[in-house]
Design a protein with these regions (language model features):
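Histidine-anchored nucleotide/phosphate-binding helix
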Residues: 53-71
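Short glycine-rich or small-residue beta-strand-to-loop segments that form or flank ligand, phosphate
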Residues: 42-51, 74-81
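N-terminal amphipathic/basic leader segments beginning at the initiator methionine
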Residues: 1-24
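Divalent-metal (Mg2+/Mn2+/Ca2+)-assisted nucleotide/phosphate chemistry catalytic cores
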Residues: 125-212, 221
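A conserved active-site cap/scaffold subdomain adjacent to cofactor or substrate pockets
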Residues: 212-270
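Glycine-rich phosphate/diphosphate-binding loops that line cofactor/substrate pockets in enzymes
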Residues: 28-44, 67-68, 246-247
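An acidic, phosphate/nucleotide-engaging active-site surface
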Residues: 89-154
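C-terminal non-catalytic interaction/assembly regions of soluble proteins
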Residues: 269-424
Length: 424
């Protein structure tokens, strides 16, 4: 076992304060064409299942601003098959983020029922959306803009995907992922988004960008006429703020946790460089020989989608898996490869030893090993001696403490995570 030091990545960030978040969310609503909806009309506000910083505050502000403007907003879960593909499950997902009728001051209408609003123009795919949203006088979706974990394109994870996949509920999500195997997601999302924009009174979306520390960097109102072009520009900004591992070639990486509240892929493929989605290519970097993942976040509620990216997992993670929840999610997305169960180990010591012994001929002095809390919290990392030495030569890295032996108790790693375990 190599000794491990602590390094930090030097990121310059300027997150919004709580007051600024509320002000930016209200201003974002003001940038939407509300006049397209008759005064007193209903506006369906789509909210997803991702763990987004300040989500409850942003949603509450959007709802309050619409109400003060003379409209009757209601919230609907726009999260595809998440929450076990049930209305009750999706309502519970929102509640875990503090989004309840009492807290938001408006109704939450949750249903898995959909209605067809059109067909694809180049591929004859049915375009379906949430029934309640389709019956509203206007639709507005709220989502974070970020690189997707399974494909690259002009728009990836954001407003367009929420309209197509999230608002499509399980049926729409299943159709989208099925057709994506032969018709790439990068082409399908814009095409189906245009069908939805033509069929419904979508007044736009509230786009959120987060910085490398997982904090709110910007909130922007995007009108429907600019939805695809503006989202593409915002995606460029999101790429620049995407946290990454600071080395391109690594022997072993330990992640203390994975989960759906961290990334749709459990472990963000933009960080791991691993992508097992049929028809899509993996990122060019980093190259990681072995990945060990220790536990599943409580916020995942057993959904271990993406566990197949790891080479070794702790038995605690395996025992925390809800197989049915995981299977529903991955059958809907079509990415069954991500449900493959890695080697399981009863102790951290056994798991780390398995990774080291299968990563090539290495010594404690030469092995390139990192330990991170998860793929979203990458500011502070444990690093082996070889990587600590490399960090001293770089202006973007700082060595916080020199390597010391890893501490185990009965085989369990007792050194705390680089940053606090747990997620919103």
């Amino acid at each position: 076992m190599p000794p491990m030091g602590v390094i930090e990545q030097a990121w310059e960030t300027d997150p919004l304060s709580d007051e600024a978040v509320a002000a930016a969310a209200a201003a974002a609503v003001g940038g939407l064409p509300l006049e397209e909806v008759p005064t007193g009309g209903s506006i369906a506000v789509g909210v997803g299942s991702r763990g987004i910083a300040n989500l409850a505050r942003i949603v509450a502000t959007v709802v309050a601003t619409l109400q003060s403007s003379g409209y009757e907003p209601f919230i609907f879960p726009a999260m595809g098959s998440h929450g076990g593909a049930t209305a009750e499950g999706q309502t519970a997902v929102l509640a875990r983020y503090g989004i309840t009728e009492a807290a938001m001051g408006c109704p939450i209408i949750a249903s898995m029922e959909t209605t067809e609003v059109g067909r694809g123009r180049t591929h004859d795919v049915p375009v379906v959306v949430d029934e309640a949203a389709a019956s509203a006088d206007g639709v507005c979706v709220i989502n974070r803009i970020k690189p997707h974990t399974s494909f690259t394109g002009d728009v990836e994870s954001g407003l367009a995907k929420m309209l197509v996949v999230g608002m499509g509920k399980q049926r729409g999500a299943k159709l989208a992922h099925q057709y994506a195997h032969d018709w790439s997601f990068s082409e399908m999302l814009p095409a189906i988004t245009e069908v939805i924009l033509d069929a419904l009174c979508v007044i736009g979306g509230i786009a959120i960008i987060e910085d490398q520390h997982d904090m709110t960097a910007a909130i922007v109102g995007v009108p429907p006429s600019e939805l695809l072009t503006a989202e593409a520009e915002l995606l460029t900004e999101a790429y620049a703020l995407l946290p990454k591992l600071p080395f391109e070639s690594l022997d072993v990486v330990i992640f203390d946790q994975m989960g759906k509240d961290i990334s749709g892929a459990g472990l963000d493929t933009n960080v791991t460089g691993r992508n097992y989605v049929m028809g899509e290519t993996a990122r060019a970097e980093p190259t990681i020989r072995r990945i060990y993942t220790r536990q599943l976040t409580t916020g995942s509620h057993g959904n271990a989608a993406g566990v197949g990216q790891a080479d070794v997992i702790h038995a605690d993670l395996y025992r925390a898996m809800d197989i049915e929840e995981t299977v529903v999610n991955l059958l809907t997305s079509g990415t069954v490869e991500n449900a493959r169960i890695p080697i399981t180990a009863e102790t951290d010591r056994a798991a780390i030893a398995a990774c080291i012994s299968t990563a090539g001929v290495r010594t404690p002095e030469t092995i390139r090993m990192l330990r991170a809390t998860d793929t979203m919290q990458l500011h502070r990392l444990y690093a082996s001696p070889a990587l600590c030495a490399a960090a001293t030569e770089r202006a973007d890295l700082r060595v916080v403490s020199e390597p010391t032996p890893m501490r185990f108790d009965g085989g369990r790693l007792v050194d705390p995570a680089p940053t606090a375990v747990g997620h919103r």
